[in-house]
Each structure stands twice: as C-alpha cells, then as structure tokens.
C-alpha cells in the first residue's frame, strides 16, 4: 500500500492526555517534523475490544498530528500464526475507520535482524548459549537473588559467529542453542539478565517458508522493527514498562540509523531507508467488567463450543462486537470516554453500551417489530381490510424521510402489552381498556380468546374510526401507546436476543474455586421467532434499526437475507443491569 497520511473518521475536540502532550512538545521543539506510530499485532488470534484502544490511539494520534501509522504484523512465532488472522486484523482496522500508511511484517526484516545480531556478537554484546530452557531458569535467579552467568558467556567472538551461522544453517535441533544478549545477570530487572534474542525453531513460516530455522524473540524484533520504520512514538500497554530498558538497549546497541549497511536487505527489496531511534511510551490497558480478554480464555470458549465461534455476537472480539451491531463510531466514542492514562482502572460495561445507544439513537432508523406475538383482530374493520400509513423513519431527524407501513384488520402486538389482570400502574391493554396503536388510532379490547389449556391466543377488539391519523379524535388522551405490525404483511424473522456473556462483574476471579466457565450467563442468548414490518426485512446485512420500544437491532452480517431475516439485539433501550 502506498504511503498516505493516516485519516481519522472523526474530528474530535483537542485531547490533552499525557501522550499527546509529549507529541506536542516533540513537534514544537523540532525533535520530530512528522510523527510515526504503528499498530503491531501478532497474527495468532482475533483482535478484541482491548485492541480497539490501541488501534484508536495509534491511528488516531497519527491522524490528529498529520503523521503516519503503519500496520505491522508481528509474525515472529510461526507455530501460532495463521493467514486467517492476518485477513481479520486488516478487516478490523478498516472497520474501525482507519487506513495504514504501510502494511509491514516483522518477517520483512528477518535478514536485517540477523545482520543486527551478528553486529551484537562482533561488538561483544551477544553470545551463543547451550543451556536448556530449564537450566536458563535456574541460572536466572529470582526477584531477590541475582542470577549466575552462563558457562558459555565468555565464548570468543569467532566461536559465537560460527555457532550462530550454524544455527542459521539449520544444523541444530529445536531448543539446542539460543543467542543471548550479554547485559547484566545481577540486574534488578530480570528482563535484563542476558535475555534470549534468537531461538531455534524448525517451523515453516507463512511468508518465508522454510528459509529460516531460527526466529528472533519478541523484544529484539519489536524494538528493531520500530527502529527500521522510523517510528517516533512506540505506544504500548503498561506491562511492557519493565521491558523498556531492554527495548532501549537493543535500539542503542544495534544503532540502525548509524549503520546503514544493516539496512541493505530492505533497500534491495525496494523499501525506503527510514531508520531512526524510537521512544517507547506506556499507557494503561483497557479493563472492562463482565468480560474476559485473555487470548487463551477466548480461544477456550471457541474450542469448547461454549460460544458459536470467534464472531459470536457475545464475544468481545472486534468481529463479535461488529456482528452484535456495535458501530465503529460507538467504539471510537468509547475509547475517547475511557481516555488515556497510566492508571489501571476497571471500566463498567454499561459505558460501552451507553456509547452504542448514543450513536444508534442518532443514526438508526426506526422500525416496528413484534418479538413475542399475540394477534389482535379489529372486528369493526371489514374482512380483508388493508391500508398504507406514512411513518417517520426518525422522530428526531427529518432528513431520514418517511416510509410506508401497511395496516390491516389483523395485527400482531407484543404479548406483554396485554394483561388480563393488570398490575398497579399498568398503562397498556386490558379487557375493555383503550390503547393507542402507534400511528394508526385508538383501539379497545372486547374479547379474549383462549385455547383448551387456558392460554390467550387472540384478542378481539375495536378501532375508534374517529381516532385515525389527522382526525380530531386522534388527540383524545389515552394512557399508553404500543407498537404493532400487520399480520397480513409482516415478515417472520429470527430474532436473537443477546445479552452479556458473563453474569458476574469479575469472571476472571477464581478465589472461590470457580473459573470463568462457571459464570457464563445462561440468558446471554435466546432465539425467538417474531414478525417485522416489510421494510425491515428488506434491510441489507449490518443495517441497524431501533425496533420501537424493544431495543437496537442489526441485520446479521452472516445469516440475514430478505427471504430469511435474522436480527441480533445489539443493546436494550435502557440499562437492564443497573443496580
């Protein structure tokens, strides 16, 4: 993809978090003329809502300051990576409203990393170690005890170069040797106790095939990847704060900007020379109650078939949230509301739901749908009577226009809108009582039809002919208004009533001997058959609506069609979880 300025989908008011303050100071001082950021996911799973914060920050920051943001796929662990995830990651970033300046892969730089490792060996900063993984752990020490030097730490430069070349040639089995940095085994930061830079892994890579039997470790590849691309501000979450000294060590000891010969493999590929020294800045990760965001746990939910796949609308993956009906605008608004800081906090799930309601209240056309149907027959209308009524598509925005809604003698109404024995304060239908049928007139129930089991199967009533739209009688006051659909014209639809996947605020809490599996909400999904007005059935997949008085729904992106409509409840009209 050609290099273009990153573009944000919105133009928010100036934000004053600490990261933006750093960027403003760097630009004002002339330290940087253009800022460069990157979003560097590993393609070993689907992105989740936590990644949305990083995406919006990385791409949004670049857009805000007229800079560039790369999408770099950190594909240094081929055993866990899959092209399926590569495609999904790009889809998610674009869905959120962002475009990358360049699409890069860590594997694009494998030869650069190899040359950089050779430089570290020549400079006396790296050595080939024969200790096993278990022995390395024993030598590393603890938080209170220093580590011990590897017996192979003082190998000569020549021997290290030869052994590293043989590692590269594939002569040794997996785990036989590693290349380690030579830093300080007594450091109080365990990350600096001679960490591994390369490991042997005879695994085919999705981009490079079997060309490499050795692969760089994350800290080494990540820091040099930023340096190669000239990233000015490398943004990551707080758990990488202790890794920053190693990040800086790798950048400084290799010094790509000062050793352009190391970049020759990129120039040979036609890539530009952009190397510079990046700065790592950490911010708090996104934590939301009623969720789990561990990739391991999300994978288990899918593999154990506790959910219906990675894009199950109850999942916290971006694919799942999208299918649920969450919008890019709502996701960006949520990230803005949460803000950027160094303080870890737990965000209430209702904040996310509130952002979706706020967006859809303004953006979603209104439609009528009946989820639990009960027939109402208006007996004073002629048999076969039908007519067409004009309805506004949005009560707050005339630009949405109007639509035609069929009306008939036989209607479907919500079963819960009728009570044979009403509770105190009831404002809907009762025997002999009146109700306003949305946009159609005032109706009364005269007769309740039941089956042999005593269940109500039909209501029979009367429509006041003087209360039709535009008539004086339409202004007569009645206690309540209900929605309806024409039984003759309505289209049967599958309606999936989704709710939160977990029933407790902290499903990760295992203090009582339970796991997140024990806290799955049995009411998180209910499939029902209902009826929608014809114009809703004709919607394109991913079209959102407010089903009046019911909630916000979206036409399922996978299963919906005009012939077999499927709607997912995105969020209720009001917070039903409020305490």
From Swiss-Prot:
GO biological process: glutaminyl-tRNA aminoacylation; glutamyl-tRNA aminoacylation
Alphabetic keyword roster: Aminoacyl-tRNA synthetase, ATP-binding, Cytoplasm, Ligase, Nucleotide-binding, Protein biosynthesis
Pfam families: tRNA-synt_1c (PF00749), tRNA-synt_1c_C (PF03950), tRNA-synt_1c_C2 (PF20974)
Compartments (UniProt record): Cytoplasm
ATP-binding in keyword set: yes
Binding site for ATP: 42-44, 48-54, 237, 285-286, 293-295
Motif range ('KMSKS' region): 292-296
Residue numbers covered by motif 'HIGH' region: 41-51
This protein's GO CC annotations: cytosol
GO molecular function: ATP binding; glutamine-tRNA ligase activity
EC number(s) recorded for this UniProt protein: 6.1.1.18
Domain of life: Bacteria
Binding site for L-glutamine: 74, 218
Catalytic activity: tRNA(Gln) + L-glutamine + ATP = L-glutaminyl-tRNA(Gln) + AMP + diphosphate
Subunit structure: Monomer.
Entry similarity comment: Belongs to the class-I aminoacyl-tRNA synthetase family.
Protein name: Glutamine--tRNA ligase
Name of the gene: glnS
């Amino acid at each position: 993809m050609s290099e273009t300025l990153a573009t944000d989908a919105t133009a928010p008011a100036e934000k004053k978090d600490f990261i933006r303050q750093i960027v403003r100071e760097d630009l004002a001082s002339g330290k940087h003329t253009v800022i460069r950021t990157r979003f560097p996911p590993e393609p070993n799973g689907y992105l989740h809502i936590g990644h949305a914060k990083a995406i919006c920050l990385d791409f949004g920051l670049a857009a805000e300051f007229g800079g560039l943001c790369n999408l770099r796929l950190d594909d240094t662990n081929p055993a866990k990576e899959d092209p399926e995830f590569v495609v999904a990651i790009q889809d998610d970033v674009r869905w959120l409203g962002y475009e990358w300046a360049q699409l890069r892969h860590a594997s694009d730089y494998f030869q650069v990393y190899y040359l950089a490792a050779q430089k570290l060996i020549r400079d006396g900063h790296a050595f080939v170690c024969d200790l096993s993984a278990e022995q390395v752990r024993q030598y590393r020490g603890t938080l209170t005890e220093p580590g011990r030097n590897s017996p192979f730490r003082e190998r000569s430069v020549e021997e290290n170069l030869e052994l590293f070349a043989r590692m590269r040639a594939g002569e040794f089995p997996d785990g036989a040797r590693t290349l380690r940095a030579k830093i300080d085994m007594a450091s109080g930061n365990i990350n600096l106790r001679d960490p591994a830079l390369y490991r042997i892994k005879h695994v085919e890579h999705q981009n490079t095939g079997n060309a490499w039997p050795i692969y760089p470790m994350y800290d080494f590849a990540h820091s040099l990847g930023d340096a190669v691309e000239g990233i000015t501000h490398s943004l990551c979450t707080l758990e990488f704060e202790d890794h920053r000294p190693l990040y800086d060590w790798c950048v400084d000891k290799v010094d790509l900007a000062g050793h352009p010969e190391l970049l020759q493999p990129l120039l040979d590929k036609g890539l530009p020379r952009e190397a510079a020294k990046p700065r790592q800045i950490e911010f708090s990760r996104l934590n939301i109650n009623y969720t789990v965001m561990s990739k391991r746990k999300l994978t288990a939910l899918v593999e154990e078939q506790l959910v219906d796949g990675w894009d199950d609308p109850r999942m916290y993956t971006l694919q799942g949230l999208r299918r649920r009906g969450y919008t890019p605008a709502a996701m960006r608004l949520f990230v803005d509301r949460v803000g950027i800081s160094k303080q870890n906090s737990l965000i209430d799930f209702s904040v996310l739901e509130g952002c979706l309601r706020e967006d859809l209240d303004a953006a979603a056309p209104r439609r009528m749908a009946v989820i639990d149907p009960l027939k109402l027959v208006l007996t004073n209308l002629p048999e076969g009577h039908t007519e067409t009524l004009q309805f506004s598509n949005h009560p707050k925005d005339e630009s949405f226009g109007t639509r035609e809604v069929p009306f008939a003698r036989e209607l479907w109404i919500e079963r819960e809108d009728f009570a044979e024995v009403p509770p105190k304060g009831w404002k809907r239908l009762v025997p002999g009582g009146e109700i306003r049928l949305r946009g159609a007139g005032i109706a009364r129930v005269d007769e309740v039809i039941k089956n042999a089991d005593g269940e109500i199967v039909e209501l029979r009533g009367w429509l006041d002919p003087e209360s039709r739209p535009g008539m004086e009688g339409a202004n007569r006051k009645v206690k309540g208004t209900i929605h309806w659909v024409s039984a003759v014209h309505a289209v049967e639809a599958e309606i999936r009533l989704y709710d939160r996947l977990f029933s407790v605020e902290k499903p990760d809490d295992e203090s009582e001997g339970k796991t997140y599996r024990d806290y799955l909400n049995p009411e998180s999904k209910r499939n029902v058959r209902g009826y929608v007005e014809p114009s809703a059935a004709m919607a394109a997949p991913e079209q959102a609506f407010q089903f009046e008085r019911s909630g916000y729904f979206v036409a399922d992106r996978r299963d919906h069609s005009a012939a077999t409509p499927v709607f997912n409840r995105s969020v209720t009209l009001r917070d039903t979880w409020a305490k």
